Amino acid sequence: MESGTEEYELNGDLRPGSPGSPDALPPRWGLRNRPINVNHYANKKSAAESMLDIALLMANASQLKAVVEQGNDFAFFVPLVVLISISLVLQIGVGVLLIFLVKYDLNNPAKHAKLDFLNNLATGLVFIIVVVNIFITAFGVQKPVMDVAPRQ
């Protein structure tokens, strides 16, 4: 076995700059040398927002069902039905708005003002939805507890 100027390790050659050597550059995920596609990023962002919107829509539908099951005897029946209905309508509106945002080309400078307005509108509506849902939670939506033990 010859011992030259090369450095050998159990797993092979560790020349400077070779993969695995201490001075090698860390591997990059994907191709970061190309410019970011703004449309692709916006579409992913809108898809994620839409999924969260659907989850909240399902939660509000479940809350509405629980309130209706409690009936008119519940102290906060009317306010909760109104707040949940407002939240549901706003969520559907934001969902439609997100669909329109995905359809527009972000690389077209002529549409930037309109897209900026629609994006700000969606953000404002999401803020209102959050505030409405805070009030829904504050009024408390829970199913009535049935007494298991007989009363005497």
UniProtKB/Swiss-Prot annotation:
Disruption phenotype: No visible phenotype in most cases. Some mice have dome-shaped heads and die within 2 months after birth. Mice show abnormal behavior, reminiscent of obsessive-compulsive disorder: mice exhibit compulsive grooming-induced hair loss and self-made lesions as well as increased anxiety-like behaviors. Mice are prone to systemic chronic inflammation in the skin, liver, kidney and pancreas. During inflammation, reduced motility of bone marrow-derived macrophages and protrusive membrane dynamics are observed. It comes from Mus musculus (Mouse). This is Ninjurin-1. Changing residue 45 to R: Disrupts the face-to-face homodimer, leading to increased ability to mediate plasma membrane rupture (cytolysis). Belongs to the ninjurin family. Residues 26-37 are annotated as: N-terminal adhesion motif. One of its GO terms (cellular component) is synaptic membrane. The modification N-acetylmethionine is found at residue 1. The modification Phosphoserine is found at residues 18, 21. Keywords: Acetylation, Angiogenesis, Behavior, Cell adhesion, Cell membrane, Cytolysis, Glycoprotein, Inflammatory response, Membrane, Phosphoprotein, Secreted, Synapse, Transmembrane, Transmembrane helix. PANTHER family: NINJURIN-1, NINJURIN-RELATED. GO terms for biological process: angiogenesis; cell adhesion; cellular hyperosmotic response; cytolysis; ferroptosis; heterotypic cell-cell adhesion; hyaloid vascular plexus regression; inflammatory response. Induction: By nerve injury. Expression is activated by p53/TP53. Residues 1-29 are annotated as: Disordered. GO terms for molecular function: cell adhesion mediator activity; cell-cell adhesion mediator activity; lipopolysaccharide binding; membrane destabilizing activity. Residues 1-10 have a biased composition (Acidic residues). Changing residue 119 to Q: Disrupts the face-to-face homodimer, leading to increased ability to mediate plasma membrane rupture (cytolysis). Residues 104-113 are cytoplasmic. Residues 44-55 are annotated as: Helix alpha1. It comes from the Eukaryota. Residues 40-69 are annotated as: Required to induce plasma membrane rupture. Glycans are attached at residue 60. Residues 1-78, 139-152 are extracellular. InterPro entries: Ninjurin. The chain crosses the membrane at residues 79-103, 114-138. Residues 58-74 are annotated as: Helix alpha2.
